[in-house]
Amino acid sequence: MSNKSVLLIAGEPSGDLLGAHLAQSLKSLEPNLKLAGMGGKRMREAGVEVFINADKLAVVGLLEILRQFRDIRHAMQTLKRYFKKTPPDLVVFIDYPGFNLHMAKQAKKAGIKVLYYVSPQIWAWRYGRIKKIKKYVDHMAVLFDFEEKLYQKENVPVSFVGHPLANAPTPSLSRNEICKQFNLDLDKPIVALFPGSREQEINKLLPMMVQAGKLIQTQIPTVQFILPLALNLALDKIRPFLSPEIKVIQNDISHVLAIAHAAVAASGTVTLEIALQQVPLVIIYKVAPLTFWLGKKLIRLSFIGLCNLVSPEPVAVELLQQDATPQAIADEVFQLLNNHNYRQSIIGKLGHLRPQLDRGNAAQNVAKVVHNLIFS
């Protein structure tokens, strides 16, 4: 029925997953819709013709961006040529604002409609980017209700589609079955480790997590550790940092969270995923000192963890830069596991998150917005 085409642009593993789910929903709605774009393995598996591999583009921090500048510039030039030679009916930019807001301008110059899925965190820093959004974006699809109110106030067309993680399916296996599959004992404490999906995060954070694990073992000898490896990472990348007691599972976060008693996580979307499953967690992060200094000057927020930002009150301790030490991590995990009142208080706070984020199937909601934009 349709010979329409949509370009999906994702620059990080989290965006690749969102793009894959959106692609599946779009194919259900319009089977003949042509989908192409920039992304990773997930989008490719979902039937998107990925002509730019985003694996090398998932960087954070000023210095890290400079190191990958050649790859980023090449991706920008490739997209710019695509906009001119094969203009799609719509471009869906998914998160990744530094790159995507620039390319939204190029898409608009080429006369292409633009949908932006996952708002830049203008409520946290660089609110001035709202001017670019007004100028180059036809419609915003946002994950949080307070973002919808913000854009409505600025007269930007917007849809609150809900957060995909709030409506994620629960594992079909029981906790006992999952433990048996992973060769773990549910009667002994299980701590999940989430060192991030970017190489520089792994290099900085995983060694600390491993050292913290050894300290935790001295206090709780029966503790077990499990690490769900991000899809874009090869085991060889993290093997040098691992210790024998850490069990590595290939990309199975939902099953890991179903059995975890506590978690240690790099700041990012995963903190919200953990929190929504009501697993008590500690958030850690380290970047280059210059990057952190600039961030403190520019960002006007008390917290960096997404689960803390969307909650009325803090739900996880954050250990950043020099405060992120193996001993500090171990001390907080010990409290989360062994201090019953503290643990129950955290779990109670985590239970309030899901209702405020759930609007049904987010990917289907975005697919309807896409359909309206290209067929209106």
From Swiss-Prot:
Enzyme Commission no: 2.4.1.182
UniProt superkingdom: Bacteria
Protein name, as recorded: Lipid-A-disaccharide synthase
Species classification: Bacteria, Pseudomonadati, Pseudomonadota, Gammaproteobacteria, Legionellales
Reactions mediated catalytically: a lipid X + a UDP-2-N,3-O-bis[(3R)-3-hydroxyacyl]-alpha-D-glucosamine = a lipid A disaccharide + UDP + H(+)
Pathways per UniProt: Bacterial outer membrane biogenesis; LPS lipid A biosynthesis
SUPFAM superfamilies associated with the record: UDP-Glycosyltransferase/glycogen phosphorylase
Gene: lpxB
Species of origin: Coxiella burnetii (strain CbuK_Q154) (Coxiella burnetii (strain Q154))
One function term, GO molecular function aspect: phospholipid binding
Keywords: Glycosyltransferase, Lipid A biosynthesis, Lipid biosynthesis, Lipid metabolism, Transferase
Any single Pfam family the record assigns to this protein: LpxB
